């Protein structure tokens, strides 16, 4: 396809599908950000995807810069993954028993992240972080957890406080239904502030079971850790007998073959994984030092279980994705992110729009800000009202960016020259829309 057929001509079918969905699903979606709450307008109902292209229910095609919020590093419907999934499904969808494939996937992941000696497979990133926190408490005999403002670790009660992702998108401080008791043992500190961490350990060190942090946050937008930040967290936790939990649900096996660990090799006690590791199907994992992981049932007293954990079809998708993602794939991911960042910066500069484009490997974000964004407060203080007009100008031109200023942009290795032509054609209009926006432009 060429750049001449790029305009989105109608969203009538998506609008009807959204109306139908709202009649049976709260808000019409099964994850809040998909409702376009932050940007307004009609959510696109996607019916198929191949390579770097999405097709909606009205037949419009979009160059995909979301990649299912990260997992699709190879692009959509990659032949190797489709074949592996088809073969696995033909042998049965779920057994409720151990399978060879789950051991293969665990071994593949352990081979890439040196501190991970044992791995437990689960069904979602939320399960992974919830279980890692429980395990840290069970291992240390302590109750308090430190998390950071803007870091999102799933929707488990104890970790929703001042979270990023959809919580930031909707402007919620936490969530109704999270009781004071559930959050009482969660200490929330500003991100990238080591002095706050040290002071908190000085006051509460003997009560702190763990610090949990995104390896490089992407759920308040991409806000990378300061140089040496994760290593300093490792040192402080080790000094006080607490565990360090590094959440690589987003970065794991995306930003490098070994995830963020391959860029910043800090030996955390526990890691969490998701997204890429299962190739777009529902699965996640947590793992770490054998001494800690062997406190899990059935070896130890810390209970964790799941009927569908280690699902053979998801395991097959994950193995195929990881084994197909060779050095050439990671080089393409980095090159595509570089190319996208240059196009974004060029268009916004030409339009006179102050901006920051922070990077975490091949993940990036766009903040409308004159100064660097280093924490959640700075992200929220950026000119987020410019984002909705920017987003819709891209969407109307057949480019599918993230529908929130507080989410990461993702590229796939399949992003091709035709897609980049479309993006380049769309960006000047989108940048002008951002330039002309006012605070009243908010949806």
Swiss-Prot record:
CDD domains associated with the record: OAT_like (cd00610)
Gene Ontology cellular-component terms for this entry are:
cytoplasm
A single GO BP annotation from the record? protoporphyrinogen IX biosynthetic process
Enzyme class at the top of the EC tree: isomerase
Recorded GO MF terms: glutamate-1-semialdehyde 2,1-aminomutase activity; pyridoxal phosphate binding; transaminase activity
| Pathway assigned in UniProt | Porphyrin-containing compound metabolism; protoporphyrin-IX biosynthesis; 5-aminolevulinate from L-glutamyl-tRNA(Glu): step 2/2
Q: List the disulfide bonds.
A: none
| Transmembrane intervals | none
N6-(pyridoxal phosphate)lysine (modified residue): where?
Answer: 275
Q: What is its EC number?
A: 5.4.3.8
List the InterPro entries hit by this protein, alphabetically: 4pyrrol_synth_GluAld_NH2Trfase (IPR004639), Aminotrans_3 (IPR005814), Aminotrans_3_PPA_site (IPR049704), PyrdxlP-dep_Trfase (IPR015424), PyrdxlP-dep_Trfase_major (IPR015421), PyrdxlP-dep_Trfase_small (IPR015422)
This protein's cofactor list reads: pyridoxal 5'-phosphate
Subcellular location, record wording: Cytoplasm
Offer one Pfam family short name for this entry. Aminotran_3
What is the reaction catalyzed? (S)-4-amino-5-oxopentanoate = 5-aminolevulinate
Q: Which family does it belong to?
A: Belongs to the class-III pyridoxal-phosphate-dependent aminotransferase family. HemL subfamily.
Q: How does it assemble?
A: Homodimer.
| Name recorded for this polypeptide | Glutamate-1-semialdehyde 2,1-aminomutase
Name its species.
Mycobacterium ulcerans (strain Agy99)
Task: Name the gene behind this protein.
Answer: hemL
